[in-house]
Regions:
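Conserved small/polar residues in nucleotide/adenosyl-binding loops
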Residues: 140-147
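Basic/hydrophobic alpha-helical interface regions
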Residues: 1-126, 135-139
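Hydrophobic alpha-helical segments, chiefly the membrane-spanning helices
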Residues: 152-155
Length: 157
């Protein structure tokens, strides 16, 4: 199914509750610049609408909840760890705000896992740096019994 860029742009603006600039480019991954308020979405050939919706939800989470400061420099926390924790934090918050995104995130991460998008199949986790291992742990852990929205991946992954 073809991704309709204008529809995804409007979705992002509606979820963000502001007139952010949405760009569709041939880039490796999605990103949101908290200073310029620009959301960049990748133009992946084989990305489903569900995966793009998840990327929109994730990046809008940054638009809504990531502060426009570099506070971690003052406390000397490596940025790779800040990124991992911030991604988990904003995903939890965006899914609380828009409860319908729970299923979108679940299905999209399941699809990415099935396609080995993260290129981890048949790899030894001990070869990855600590921040990546923490991120994969957050992605691949089963949901908490009290809050299924805490996990970003299906428990079967």
């Amino acid at each position: 199914m073809t991704v309709q860029h204008e529809i995804k742009s409007q979705l992002a603006k509606l979820l963000a509750t502001e007139d952010i600039l949405v760009e569709h480019k041939k880039v490796e991954t999605a990103e949101f610049n908290v200073q310029t308020r620009v959301l960049t979405l990748p133009m992946w050939e084989k990305a489903s609408n569900g995966v793009i919706d998840m990327l929109v939800g994730h990046e809008v989470g940054h638009a809504l909840y990531t502060p426009n400061t570099e506070w971690w420099k003052e406390v000397q926390i490596p940025q790779q760890f800040v990124n991992v924790v911030e991604d988990a934090r904003i995903e939890k918050l965006i899914k609380r705000r828009y409860e319908g995104l729970n299923k979108t995130f679940y299905n999209a991460y399941h699809e990415l896992s099935d396609k080995d998008f993260f290129d981890i199949e048949n790899k030894d986790m001990s070869d990855f740096n600590l921040a990546d291992r923490v991120n994969f742990c957050l992605l691949y852990t089963s949901p908490s019994p009290r809050d299924s929205a805490l996990s970003r991946m299906p428990s079967s992954a």
